[in-house]
């Protein structure tokens, strides 16, 4: 199959150690008409000692904790992060190309194959596993791919007899903030994630893609109609339900950058729709006992909330959920028990009906964007619905959440699996379990 051949080629690109010399890089820069750029860590100007290119073994940069160049994520202005510390290249690629067309990607692939240089692909850089970087690699940065187009009746290429649907095409450099604003202006709803700077056509969609509305309308991969991609053999391909079907299946779940570089993604959109929002929180000084009671209430309500279409974030002492299925009265009834509990314990409650998803996005997500950052331990636990269906399963969940709180952690879950989505299973390459998970 085409996809298995391409995967073999691309794995070689990703795992190569890199043998390119100065002459090779100069030749590539000439081929690209001067568009090859040297990459240095963002924070390097803050450091008095910059040794960005002293490391000769790329694996040392990737694994040695001292080979980094970081500011304090919680306070980027703090001088303590770089006082008496040397800045090193770390996992930042040696060189990068600001990709503006398919031709630049093809030239990069040809160079990588000839010199055995690793390729890293960066959209917005939101990759928990760091795959958008790579010591010694040639980085393909797709931010300049800024296509943004709305079509009221889109038909995928070579699907001439298929009925058209409303769709938006996003270049690989478009982020959610851009496409949400664009969709709002067109009077439609684009279904994506909650991070405004996350790319709409990158790793988010190719690893499944979930968000507030996924409960009802499916994952990002369920909504993709067509990809334009440069595969590692240097060919620009259109992948949809009518051509390159195996590649289309694989791109929807196979992970960001696995089969090539996405140039654009065309995604089905929905009409403008109202959304009920519940933002319920306990005070910051809430006791462990009250937090445990909150957790118990949430665990016992999870399946009901999922069936009502509520999607979003559920945490210890805080819930921010939205659903397009309920009226205001229905939403208040659905969340009544949690709301009453929060009020009894000095918490805040806001249950409201907003005119569309964009209003929820601008009111609750944009306003809570942090300038810095904080420590986060993420994991990929997917909790099946059956864990909530019996007392033993609920107790195990309760015990684990209570333990996390007791050791100073603030546990939270993304309640964004497609619990009530009615799409056909296994039309794409995502994990089967997405379809029957409670959380």
UniProtKB/Swiss-Prot annotation:
GO molecular function (one): oxidoreductase activity
Cross-referenced InterPro entries: FAD-bd_PCMH, FAD-bd_PCMH-like_sf, FAD-bd_PCMH_sub2, FAD-linked_Oxidoreductases_BP, Oxid_FAD_bind_N
Glycosylation sites: 29, 84, 285, 300
Any single Pfam family the record assigns to this protein: FAD_binding_4
Xref: SUPFAM superfamilies: FAD-binding/transporter-associated domain-like (SSF56176)
Occurrences of domain FAD-binding PCMH-type (ranges): 89-272
Required co-factors: FAD
Known pathway: Mycotoxin biosynthesis
Secretion signal span: 1-19
Source species, domain of life: Eukaryota
EC number: 1.-.-.-
UniProt keyword list: FAD, Flavoprotein, Glycoprotein, Oxidoreductase, Signal, Virulence
Protein family membership: Belongs to the oxygen-dependent FAD-linked oxidoreductase family.
Role of this protein: FAD-linked oxidoreductase; part of the gene cluster that mediates the biosynthesis of the mycotoxins phomacins, leucine-derived cytochalasans with potent actin polymerization-inhibitory activities and monocot-specific antigerminative activities. The first step in the pathway is catalyzed by the hybrid PKS-NRPS phmA, assisted by the enoyl reductase phmE, that are responsible for fusion of the leucine precursor and the polyketide backbone to produce a 2-pyrrolidone intermediate.
PANTHER family (UniProt xref): FAD BINDING DOMAIN PROTEIN (AFU_ORTHOLOGUE AFUA_6G12070)-RELATED, GULONOLACTONE OXIDASE
Protein name as catalogued: FAD-linked oxidoreductase phmC
Organism for this UniProt entry: Phaeosphaeria nodorum (strain SN15 / ATCC MYA-4574 / FGSC 10173)
